[in-house]
Amino acid sequence: MHSTRSTLVILAALVLNASLLFAQEKKPRVSPHETVNATVGEAKITIVCGRPYTKDPKSGEKRKIWGGLVPYGKVWRMGADEATLLTTDKAISIGGTAIEAGTYSLYLLPAEEGAKLIVNKQTGQWGTKYDESQDLVRIDLKKQTLDAPVDQFAIAVEKTAADGVLKLTWENTQYSAAIAVKK
């Protein structure tokens, strides 16, 4: 009898805890997420990333991004929340570096004079859980200063005559690299 009562108390506590977990309201993300779909040659490319703003979500104050919020010389998750994902259904090259078909996490290693795009084999992790041993390649990106600032981080794949250009834009800076189907 005593063990039945204990079992019922434990069962009731578990049910109550489970219902509290499911009843929690999901809050909207501070940084919206975006899926970029592009076709380069015959390759279908998808990039999923969080898009943080220049303004601090709590104070509303404008932040210095490059060399501030995103420090030079430190790996950045390239967006907000989970690691940014790149999926390609065909082998491609970015900045002349070959990448086989598959899904990868993208990171950025910014410096004052440029940046390196890091293509990492580990996926599904929170953006700050970077494991350098899983790096597939590091690709040099071109840096360009923009005439007008961009308030929200953006990733785009823009078509060119035959291939495309990967562009990462935020604040007053754009990083880019050619993207093509691997031949």
Task: Give residue spans per PLM region.
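Mid-length scaffold segments of soluble, non-membrane domains
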Residues: 74-125, 129
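Sec/Tat signal peptide C-region and signal peptidase I cleavage site
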Residues: 19-23
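Bacterial N-terminal signal peptides that target proteins for export
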Residues: 1-10
